[in-house]
Amino acid sequence: MIIAIDAGHGGQDPGAIGKNKFQEKNITLSIAKKLTKLLNHTNFFKAVMIRRGNYFLSVFKRTQIAEKYHANLLISIHANSSKNRKISGVSIWVLPKNVHNTRIQKHKLNKKTKNIHKKINTKTSKFKNFYEIEYDLAKIIIQELRKVSTLNQKKPKYAKFGILKFSQFPSILVETGFISNPIEEQHLNKKFYQNLISKSISIALKKYFLKRIKQYN
């Protein structure tokens, strides 16, 4: 199972900036590196990083890189921001089902997309569609993250983010906390907290795919 890890923003695009001037692009890269390392220490996943340093990549280029690595799944790492500095917590985003169904129909006759479906089915047996994979996995990631962090939302949220919309494989966006919240900004910049977030996502991924394999064997 090949998982593409996308560190949000980069280069001239710092992403959100906290009160203490910590930048989202640096936090996402650090968490992405830790998550990639954890996944590659398992015998179940091969993780590849889309952005490896401090440089800018368009959404289109990110999806291109993931496709180049023949990714079966994409996890995009971000940090949230709000004008209300009291808001905090983790949230997980997936593509709305109606948009998903339209996207699937558009790629239905695309041989490459069919091959991606085949790869997913080979590793995790039969899935109905991308939406099911994303939503069910997102719920398990939330279950794990709530053990180490506060939640902004108890269920996966819907959005038409470019990285979700233009990927030709299941994709999930993880907002690891609010960098606009001074306390959470400090947490997000600490290696200990980044390790907790990375480990939680790694555990969730393994739980989800093992569950699916057992379910359909």
UniProtKB/Swiss-Prot annotation:
Signal peptide extent: none
UniProt key word Cell wall biogenesis/degradation: yes
Alphabetical keyword list: Cell wall biogenesis/degradation, Hydrolase, Secreted
Annotated SUPFAM superfamilies: Zn-dependent exopeptidases (SSF53187)
Cellular localization per UniProt: Secreted
Top-level taxon: Bacteria
Record GO biological process: cell wall organization; peptidoglycan catabolic process
GO molecular function term, any single one: N-acetylmuramoyl-L-alanine amidase activity
Function: Cell-wall hydrolase involved in septum cleavage during cell division.
Similarity comment: Belongs to the N-acetylmuramoyl-L-alanine amidase 3 family.
Record's protein name: Putative N-acetylmuramoyl-L-alanine amidase
Gene name of this polypeptide: amiB
